[in-house]
């Protein structure tokens, strides 16, 4: 099966849809990375997806290496999830009242992550981190939060400073509209630098409510924590009476049955979850020690609420996803990530392109760099201008990678031999495009 067999022949319909969208939606998209700003070209408007395959409005099919930015570990339109969603929708879409399924999902999640004793369901990862930070401040009576450069915790004003994900993709230091007052109690430190954390606690320890960190960052590209880093954060926060918030929105229930906690079991005070836990529908959660969580209303004074929180259709999708994700699914995820990493490394090595392919379980990234990437500064110093030609060569061959050098690559358990043949066929051309790129290749 040659790469020309899968060449994308036309994107005319996607281009028209993007023009139409730009007339009614700012930038034509509802999340900035989707606009292809970092790579240029026409965003693909997807009309359907099954297994590991996406189909766009022009009928082009792509092997999916984004998986809706992480959630689709089973692949798209998995029968068990579709059946659960259909059954739930038949019984009503939203009630504004408690439902049995939200309790079932909460219990399923609590059973997988030992430090989580209570869980509150919300509608997005942003809501989860925002609420966790508010709760940490309410519980400790302190105001300051430490976050790390390159870690992204949703578009919460106080946490956008020097963030990853779309903020990194667009090259923004923060965002207009975030006031000095909103960010005044946020301390931003370099990632993987424990000495900076210790020094900051020595200076401000009595004012620090919490440290928030991605369990294993994936929003500046995949940049795993150094050995013992999260455990050291646990130790220093405990020493100073601050809370540790571990953001598992991306890693939770993806990199293992218990998320990053299953790989690096650090007993944080609070965790945030999203993506996989709702099976591709809008839902998220935060949870942790009962003593902390029971400060939430209606038991305590820290307020948090949401009209659609615990939505029965989203709960059904999440519960079906977690129950279908057995040991075989996680073995397939790991094997597929291994296979993809080998193909990437082989093609880039053959083309003479310096590269790093860091891993966080079955998540990975491609950095065009001679040296390992251990923090946001190193990620930004990589030769990211090589990424756009690399990306477009893959996309034109019917492979759908992340559209930014600063995003993670995700596999599903449904990624099959046909998809891998397509990826293997496309990579040599893509690697040569990266090799021939210059700084002027930026879109």
From Swiss-Prot:
Pathway: Porphyrin-containing compound metabolism; protoporphyrin-IX biosynthesis; 5-aminolevulinate from L-glutamyl-tRNA(Glu): step 2/2. It comes from the Bacteria. GO terms for cellular component: cytoplasm. It is found in: Cytoplasm. One of its GO terms (molecular function) is transaminase activity. One of its GO terms (biological process) is protoporphyrinogen IX biosynthetic process. Its EC number is 5.4.3.8. It catalyses: (S)-4-amino-5-oxopentanoate = 5-aminolevulinate. The keyword Flavoprotein does not apply. Keywords: Cytoplasm, Isomerase, Porphyrin biosynthesis, Pyridoxal phosphate. The modification N6-(pyridoxal phosphate)lysine is found at residue 275. Homodimer. NCBIfam families: hemL, PRK00062.1. Belongs to the class-III pyridoxal-phosphate-dependent aminotransferase family. HemL subfamily. This is Glutamate-1-semialdehyde 2,1-aminomutase. It comes from Mycobacterium marinum (strain ATCC BAA-535 / M). The lineage of its organism: Bacteria, Bacillati, Actinomycetota, Actinomycetes, Mycobacteriales.
């Amino acid at each position: 099966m040659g790469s020309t067999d899968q060449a994308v022949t036309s994107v005319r319909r996607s281009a028209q849809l993007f023009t139409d969208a730009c007339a009614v939606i700012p930038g034509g998209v509802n999340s900035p990375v989707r606009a292809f700003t970092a790579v240029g070209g026409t965003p693909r408007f997807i009309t359907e997806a099954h297994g590991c395959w996406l189909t766009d409005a022009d009928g082009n099919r792509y092997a999916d290496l984004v998986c809706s930015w992480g959630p689709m570990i089973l692949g798209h339109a998995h029968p068990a999830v579709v059946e659960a969603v259909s059954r739930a929708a038949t019984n009503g879409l939203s009630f504004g009242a408690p439902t049995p399924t939200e309790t079932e999902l909460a219990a399923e999640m609590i059973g997988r992550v030992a430090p989580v004793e209570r869980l509150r369901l919300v509608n997005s990862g942003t809501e989860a981190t925002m609420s966790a930070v508010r709760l940490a401040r309410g519980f400790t009576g302190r105001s300051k939060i430490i976050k790390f450069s390159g870690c992204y915790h949703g578009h919460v004003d106080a946490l956008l400073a020097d963030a990853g994900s779309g903020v990194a993709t667009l090259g923004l230091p923060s965002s207009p509209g975030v006031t000095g007052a909103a960010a005044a109690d946020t301390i931003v430190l370099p990632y993987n630098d424990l000495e900076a954390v210790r020094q900051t606690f020595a200076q401000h320890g009595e004012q620090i409510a919490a440290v928030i960190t991605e369990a294993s960052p994936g929003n500046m590209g995949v940049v795993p924590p150094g050995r013992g880093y999260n455990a050291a954060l646990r130790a220093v926060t405990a020493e100073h009476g601050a809370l540790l918030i571990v953001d598992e929105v991306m890693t939770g229930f993806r990199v293992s049955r218990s998320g990053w906690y299953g790989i690096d079991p650090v007993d944080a005070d609070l965790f945030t979850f999203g993506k996989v836990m709702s099976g591709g529908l809008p839902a998220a959660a935060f949870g942790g020690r009962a003593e902390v969580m029971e400060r939430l209303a209606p038991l305590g004074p820290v307020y948090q609420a949401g009209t659609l929180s615990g939505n029965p259709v989203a709960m059904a999708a999440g519960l079906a996803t977690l129950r279908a994700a057995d040991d075989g699914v996680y073995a397939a995820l790991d094997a597929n990530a291994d296979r993809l990493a080998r193909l990437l490394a082989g093609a880039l090595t053959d083309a003479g392109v310096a590269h790093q392919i860091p891993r966080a379980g079955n998540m990975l990234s491609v950095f065009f760099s001679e040296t390992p990437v251990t923090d946001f500064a190193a990620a930004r110093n990589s030769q990211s201008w090589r990424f756009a030609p690399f990306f477009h060569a893959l996309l034109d061959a019917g492979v759908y990678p992340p559209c930014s050098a600063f995003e993670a690559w995700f596999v599903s358990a449904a990624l099959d031999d046909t998809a891998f043949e397509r990826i293997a066929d496309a990579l040599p051309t893509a690697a040569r495009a990266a090799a021939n790129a210059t700084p002027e290749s930026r879109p």
